[in-house]
Design a protein with these regions (language model features):
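Conserved Class I SAM-dependent methyltransferase catalytic core
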Residues: 1-45, 58, 220
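C-terminal substrate-recognition regions of SAM-dependent nucleic acid methyltransferases
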Residues: 44-203, 209-249
Length: 249
């Protein structure tokens, strides 16, 4: 009748790969048999000296129960307690205080920023792509990449671009696909963006928002840096991974 387990919390919103946590998350959120869910965003508060990206949680499932879960979120001396429907969203929003704000945002029914955001490896160049050179040659295009842990740019033959060729001639706001771990607060949530003029491409170290004009790119960059934008992202980004899905609301 009862199941009690302690597990990493990254199932709530994140996890590498689509299939790794998606099925488990859907089952956990859709099954109303969870009586108690206790979440520790900072795993070291449960296991001192141990780092678990996204935190630790434990839950009590009751096969005879069908109702709301009593959710406790514990971070240091602060504790939030609420009775909640776990399936209110497609991911579990850990901070109860954020739910009211999120409802107001969703009520606007505005178009998601993901409509101008690419997926990973937008030009099919992997993060370790090497077929580039430091000086411009005929039919080259600038390529933005990370080499030896540093952001830099080089040149690559336009003919090597096999994917999203229509996006070469767009202004881009490049954003890293991983940043931080999300355990301690306050923190930036997202890495620093780069504006890449048209024409340009990038390796798989980046995704990008694509627009037509420089001023639009500057507007996206400015919005990306706001606390409001990062707050919304933080509701889905609970590990270091910053995949396209974390920008979805």
């Amino acid at each position: 009748r009862y199941v009690c387990m302690i597990i990493p919390s990254r199932w709530m919103a994140g996890g590498r790969g689509v299939g790794d946590f998606e099925g488990f998350r859907q089952r956990m959120l859709g099954d109303h048999g969870t009586r108690e869910l206790v979440d520790f965003p900072v795993a070291s508060e449960v296991f001192p000296g141990v780092e678990v990206k996204g935190g630790i949680c434990y839950f009590l499932w009751d096969g005879m129960y069908n109702g709301k879960a009593r959710v406790r979120t514990i971070r240091g001396d602060e504790q939030q307690v609420a009775l909640r429907n776990l399936d209110e969203f497609d991911v579990f929003v850990r901070d109860q205080r954020a739910v009211d704000i999120l409802h107001k945002v969703l009520a606007k029914k505005e178009q998601s920023i993901t409509t101008i955001l690419t997926n990973k490896e937008p030009f099919k160049f992997e993060t370790n792509f090497k077929d580039h050179h430091p000086k411009q040659r005929d039919r080259d295009v600038p390529i933005y990449l990370i080499a030896s842990g540093k952001r830099t740019s080089a040149w690559v033959k336009t003919d090597l671009v096999e994917k999203n060729t229509h996006l070469i001639k767009t202004w881009k706001v490049l954003v890293p696909q991983a940043y931080g771990a999300g355990e301690t607060t306050p923190h930036q949530i997202l890495g620093k963006p780069i504006i890449a003029p048209s024409p340009s491409v990038c390796t798989g170290s980046f995704m990008f928002f694509h627009v037509k004009l420089k001023r639009e790119a500057e507007s996206v960059q400015s919005y990306y840096a706001t606390k409001f934008f990062r707050f919304l992202v933080s509701l889905r980004k609970i590990t270091q991974l910053a995949q396209r899905s974390v920008y979805t609301w």
